[in-house]
Amino acid sequence: MSSATLEKLLGLFDRREQRTLPPIIRGDTRAERMELRENLRIALESLESSGMFEQRDSTGKTLVDSLLRLAEETLWDPFAREPGRTRIFFELVFNVFDPKRINQGLKGTCAAACIEGYLAERDPAEYSRIVAGLVTREGLVTMKSGQMLVCNEDVLAPHEREQRRNAVSRIFQAACMEFAYPNMPYDNVVDGHFHGDDNVGSGLEINAFERLLQAITGQTWKTITVMHSRLAKQFASFGVETRDVVHIGRDGVAIIDQAARQNEQVFVTLELPSMPNPIPHAEPPVLYNMPHKVRALRVDWTNRVVHYDDPMDPDRRWFDGAEMTLHDSFGHCSMPIDDFSRLMTEMSYRPEFFTREADQQAPAQPRTE
């Protein structure tokens, strides 16, 4: 039997949806909207029965408090008209119910999408609080770090490069991109940061990513890069002791393995050797040495592969220079350990989950410089 809270949420959704003109999705029918409502009920019932409704965010409020806030409070002006509230509500519920659906579309927001997926999986109450804050009233929210995340995204209409990225993910990721570079506004439509009138491109460099990651999670993360390893190697050539320096080539796979054994994930930048430009008719047709952020999930020593979540959610192999296997349509991929280790250029991990002396099932393969 459904609880009073669940029925209240569905009731609020019903009242909103009856006034949704035009339909939520162009061309949808009443039957399709009823199917959407039933899927929403299933998702809400699952969240309630699993106890997720009562999970608390960093302010002590529950996940259901954020859902009710989103359903009842005044929205930030650009989202106030229907189908804004209806669409945002069910997209948030589905993102929490099934975080695997979170992706970057064809935008250069792989880093922000990785953080969004991580937060929705690991701290759904905090994720819901942040989304509710971004879309209600002033369009801003205080993160765990005490810093403000601000929503400047003012359009819910889909863009061709959104692909399967939903409206909530677009709002969240655009706000993250804006925060990561406080002195360079981000434009979601053209997918770029602006320095004055100059579009300097999309994506996040490692310092910007680290700033965003620590602000969102409230945790301390350690970042290592190929450059750190090269400097350590150079110092070692002058007789400086560098054995205690964490080396991404030597230790990277071990870090992923130890983190996974303690139910933690690692953020990794892979430098993809070459790839067809994913944007139709865009120039150049082939891109080379492109950085791409993924979440490393675990190491399978038996099959000698690293499992990872690709925020592109590819439906086919989309880059060259390494073997990769797709396990589903939601970004679960795997890559041979040797290839993954060779492509790693940056890694952000929780330092308390890695110890050099820890017993390893198998050693990581050193990078060949």
Segments predicted by a language model, with ranges:
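Short, aromatic- and cysteine-enriched interfacial helices/patches
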Residues: T5, L12-F13, M52-F53, L212, ...
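Hydrophobic, Leu/Ile/Phe/Ala-enriched alpha-helical segments that form helix-helix packing faces
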Residues: C114, Y118, L213, L231-F235
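Active-site signature of cysteine proteases
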Residues: A4-L10, I25, W221-E369
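Active-site cradle of extracellular carbohydrate-active enzymes
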Residues: H193-A232
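Active-site nucleophile-adjacent alpha helix/oxyanion-hole segment immediately C-terminal to the catalytic cysteine
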Residues: K8-Q18, P22-I42, G51, S58-N199, ...
